[in-house]
């Protein structure tokens, strides 16, 4: 028996050699790819033998996705060739890739196909009798019950006990299995189980699997308009960059991934009925996206009362990965989700620690009071809306300790800290990581450029150097900011948070050994003109301790 996973999706199976050659050229699989998978049972006419499928298992990252012992569940027989079977069209979307076990941040994902087949007499046509009736189950019959694919359904205590004993015996017998490697191309392995039956064989195929897109759905309610704005955002992932460098353009450094989108669908569903919604701003499809591109489409929904169930939507993205003009891999991603709204955060002041520091050090209503406050350290630590003010970050240290309690000897420093670029131009900053500790570092760099809620009027007055003695005595109330002032502050600090984008987001740094130094080149692009005395939100995550550290305080960027 042979299994073909050809790169070309237009093959109809009329030429076995074309299937084989296209299969040999495949080096990877895309998550949600519409695979053109074939099984060819080539019999032995001299010995009057033929092969039948006994079991099929598909695993992603060692997690079992699906399993079946009946070939009719997933395959259809080709009319003109009774020995050739083709994977059903809906199996990839409904069964094979109905999971989230593939990570798109650069993790080494693997998919494995395991086929167990048996050689039988060609005159013996009762294929069903060869299979264990207790072991015949499929996910199609129970997909509506949302059974976890890595677990086997229990139908009765008697059948479960019988199956358990059989699995135990099979496990003991597999320890004595003799493996015969027929071919190692494309990670193919053929095995013969001579301990139980010399006519039982196993075929294994393993490929790296990549998820090309990062996707998210953001929802916000506008009570004044009685509606919900639902934003569908997606962009190319870190794994797509690895795929491009390793398999698509291994010899070229400046080549980009190319995705051709044919469908971007957002459907409102209710039971069996569904209706497709159009985005507020028209999105022309088909469209083409390249590496580092980001696409957003916003949809408008009716705001429902709190007592009712939230909206449920189905999102579908259909696109093709273009390897070259005559070879494209079809990918179809589809999922259902509820349109949930986050609880609105009230306008609150910053921590009492900052307020107490300001009240103790500020004793003048003039600008000198603010200067004294900066020198005493009160305003140097003040954050407005979660964003460090560049006015007081110019003198920030360029080196920062990762985890003072555990890894106090880890330092970060930007080598080229003073950058001057033109708006829209990409630039690179080199981050030096000095690991003087005795432990290796497993780090990820990411940029979280979000703006938190605006602080209260008390902290804004403190930041402007206004005397707080009257506030301590209760003569001046701590009134909240007006909507106009909040909007002005939002525009003021939006540039700090959103003016620079990290192109190499979720950058996985190779493990830094103890007492070693590593240089990481971080790629940015500036989309808003201005001076940035800090990159607030640029952080490093230690995967071993789950600790975060901000490393953007030592940066200084001027975008013209």
From Swiss-Prot:
Keywords attached to this entry: Cell wall biogenesis/degradation, Cytoplasm, Golgi apparatus, Phosphoprotein, Transport
Source species, domain of life: Eukaryota
Phosphoserine modification, residue list: 393, 398
Entry-linked InterPro entries: IgD1_Trs65, IgD2_Trs65, IgD3_Trs65, Trs65
Signal peptide feature range: none
Cell wall biogenesis/degradation found in the keyword field: yes
Subunit composition and interactions: Part of the multisubunit TRAPP (transport protein particle) II complex composed of BET3, BET5, TRS20, TRS23, TRS31, TRS33, TRS65, TRS120 and TRS130. Interacts directly with TRS120 and TRS130.
Protein name: Trafficking protein particle complex II-specific subunit 65
